[in-house]
């Protein structure tokens, strides 16, 4: 299949809400997706990710902006002229058609000759592991198998791009993990440019070449899973991707390559650009749970805390620690620490300065 890029330029979409009035569902979205890459739109409910997807599909028109599939401007092109494969959240299978007929539906619309139709349907059914299911109907197969039928129907037409709107939301947790791996395998083997929509951060991190974080109709940050996790550009992204702790701090000293902050009367040197940060400024500092280190003895350069909860999760242990009224979540991948530390035990808390982050607030 020929892979093409997808380019969204200054996309706006407003809907009229009977209570809220005009709602900006999509607000100046710009996104470039390279050919054969899978990009996920990730964000909370109502952030504009599905609206963006259906505008790429042609089911809605943007109020402003342009959509390109490769070199072709498809902004005003009808959905059925765009040659796009779409996998719906509820699969949208035809209940009165067999599995074979569901998968072949798009080929019949395209008036593909019967012999070629049969060859292409069988080829796709083999790829998704549904050989032998041809005569069955949607209600006779499992949710995971229905999802694979929907995926097969979307890709059998050899679309320019593949769009997936929360395709795993109706599956149980274990099946979601297996099915997302299958989707990724197919997408890569077919070199198919794809946009995937989900609110599940783990799903997005597992399946994507890049992730576009959305909130309130805007794209906040685009990057790989690693970039978003380790280098978030805002408090919103830091909190949305993975777990993170928030600590109150005060700026003590500002230099060109670092900032010294005070957290509960302990000083920490944070390597960072310091634009707009001033001494005595109150800020929030953030750190991931796995970067915090516990010790049995409270050293001079450590915070003092009390363990209020501990949970054994096999390969890791989760601790909840009270630090001067502030709750910290701490993850240890050394399972023996579950027995090492007791509930209500006083512990030392080491915060590595290089793992601390802070973000300028708007208007600062």
Predicted regions and their residues:
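ABC ATPase nucleotide-binding domains
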Residues: 79-85, 89, 93-239
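The feature captures the beta-strand-to-loop junction immediately N-terminal to the Walker
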Residues: 42-44
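Pre-Walker A (P-loop) beta-loop-beta motif of ABC nucleotide-binding domains
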Residues: 29-40, 94
């Amino acid at each position: 299949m020929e892979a093409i890029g997808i380019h969204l330029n200054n996309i706006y979409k407003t809907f009229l809400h009977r209570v809220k009035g005009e709602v900006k569902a999509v607000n100046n979205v710009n996104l470039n997706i390279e050919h054969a890459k899978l990009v996920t739109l990730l964000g909370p409910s109502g952030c504009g990710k599905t609206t963006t997807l259906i505008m790429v599909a042609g089911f809605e028109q943007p109020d402003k902006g342009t959509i390109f599939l490769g070199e072709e401007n498809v902004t005003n092109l009808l959905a059925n002229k765009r040659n796009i494969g779409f996998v719906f959240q509820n699969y949208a299978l035809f209940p009165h058609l067999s599995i074979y007929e569901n998968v072949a539906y798009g080929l019949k619309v395209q008036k593909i000759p019967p012999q070629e139709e049969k060859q292409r349907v069988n080829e796709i059914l083999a790829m998704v592991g549904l050989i032998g299911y041809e005569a069955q109907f949607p209600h006779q197969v499992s949710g995971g198998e229905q999802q694979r039928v929907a995926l097969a129907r979307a890709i059998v037409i050899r679309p320019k791009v593949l769009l997936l709107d929360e395709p795993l939301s109706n599956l149980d947790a274990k099946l979601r993990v297996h099915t997302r791996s299958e989707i990724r395998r197919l997408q890569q083997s077919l070199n198919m440019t794809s946009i995937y929509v989900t609110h599940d951060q783990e799903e997005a991190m597992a399946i994507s070449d890049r992730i576009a974080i959305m909130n309130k109709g805007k794209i906040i940050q685009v990057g790989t899973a690693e970039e978003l996790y380790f280098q978030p550009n805002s408090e919103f992204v830091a909190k949305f991707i993975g777990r993170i702790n928030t600590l109150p701090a005060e700026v003590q000293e500002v230099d060109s390559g670092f900032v010294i902050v005070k957290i509960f009367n302990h000083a920490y040197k944070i390597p960072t650009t310091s634009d707009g940060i001033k001494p005595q400024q109150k800020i929030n500092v953030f750190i991931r749970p796995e970067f915090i280190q516990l010790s049995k003895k409270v050293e001079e350069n450590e915070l003092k805390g009390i363990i209020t909860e501990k949970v054994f999760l096999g390969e890791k242990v989760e601790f909840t620690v009270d630090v001067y009224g502030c709750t910290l979540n701490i993850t240890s991948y050394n399972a023996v620490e579950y027995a090492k530390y007791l509930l209500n035990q006083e512990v030392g808390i080491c915060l590595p300065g290089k793992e601390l982050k802070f973000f300028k607030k708007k208007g600062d």
